[in-house]
Amino acid sequence: VEKRYLEEQQIIEDSFRLGVQIFESGFRPTFIVGLWRGGSAVGIYVQECLQTLGVQTDHIALRTSYPGLPDYQNMVETPERIRVHGTQYLIENLNIDDGLLIVDDVFSSGHNITAVINRLSTKLKRNMPEEVRIATLYQRTGYNRTTLKPDFCLHETSDWLVFPYELKGLSHEEIAANKPYVAPYLRS
């Protein structure tokens, strides 16, 4: 799999562009959920953008049990093992008439977002918002294993994306070549 290393500035700019895309669509979320890790950062920028454009939202990050690149294939093969953590606030506050926006950095297999929606639906029952939308910076083409698809997306790619904060699953050589600013800190 080809790895593509992303720069922080591009993620920031794309996150604001994603916020504008959501705003221009007419969708007005009342809750934004950023999926920890990458989706939480994107969610912060989207929330700030929407707030500046006059859309007030409640916002929170949720975490799934997906640990990253080394475990990707296991997650694809056994999606029922994905756990969703940190839903209590949403369970206590979401209602059927809320607009829920789920934000992630990359939409790949769709299993993580499916796990979040299933967990919320199970707990909220009739209070599950009727309007649930998905926003992501990237969609990995050909990897979706669900019936979901992003409602808002900026880029399609088949590359494995490596975000600026990611180190797990990278060799020392890859870090030295693609993240030279980090390499000196990792020498023991």
Annotate each predicted stretch with a short phrase.
Residues V1-S188:
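PRPP-associated nucleotide enzymes
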